[in-house]
Amino acid sequence: MFKGIVEGIGIIEKIDIYTDLDKYAIRFPENMLNGIKKESSIMFNGCFLTVTSVNSNIVWFDIFEKEARKLDTFREYKVGDRVNLGTFPKFGAASGGHILSARISCVASIIEIIENEDYQQMWIQIPENFTEFLIDKDYIAVDGISLTIDTIKNNQFFISLPLKIAQNTNMKWRKKGDKVNVELSNKINANQCW
């Protein structure tokens, strides 16, 4: 379980594509390197991954399952992209946010971004077959960020992220049309990334 709070922003340094797996090299921020080692559990844009190796500040992950690559946003990533990172909370630590399984329910599309002095707001559209799982004022996670659904319209939902928080996540670089990972408040989890 993860906290739904972004602890740092990683940068994709390298992607190696193979027949049965993809290998991702992520440059980690200095504040997250302490304690990161092989087999550490990491939240990567809302998806649970296991570290395969660490070389200085470069952390490697393997994405094995073809279905995982098909269902989440891994197929969208390119070198230079920024990703949200989080770690498994230590026993007894305050969680904040809401507890996430880091199992992606579906991939959604950003259809509108509205920014003002205090908030970054978005309309996000999920696949129609997940509409029934949207609950007004319920928790939802977008790329691993714990949020509350403000409004629902058909298969779209509206969220407001305080600007000071948005500036410390990959949402700072998001634009209309981008794909994001969504976890639907533990009501349904269709996929797990390893």
Swiss-Prot record:
Lumazine-binding repeats lie at residues 1-98, 99-194. FMN binds at residues 179-183. GO terms for biological process: bioluminescence; riboflavin biosynthetic process. InterPro entries: ATP_synth_asu-like_sf (IPR023366), Lumazine-bd (IPR001783), Lumazine-bd_dom (IPR026017), Riboflavin_synthase-like_b-brl (IPR017938). Its cofactor is FMN. Binds 1 FMN non-covalently. One of its GO terms (molecular function) is riboflavin synthase activity. The keyword Repeat applies. The keyword Flavoprotein applies. Keywords: Flavoprotein, FMN, Luminescence, Repeat. Homodimer. Antenna protein that modulates the color of the bioluminescence emission of the luciferase. In the presence of YFP and only at temperatures below 20 degrees Celsius, luciferase exhibits a bimodal emission spectrum with a new peak at 545 nM (yellow), in addition to the one at 485 nM. This is Yellow fluorescent protein.
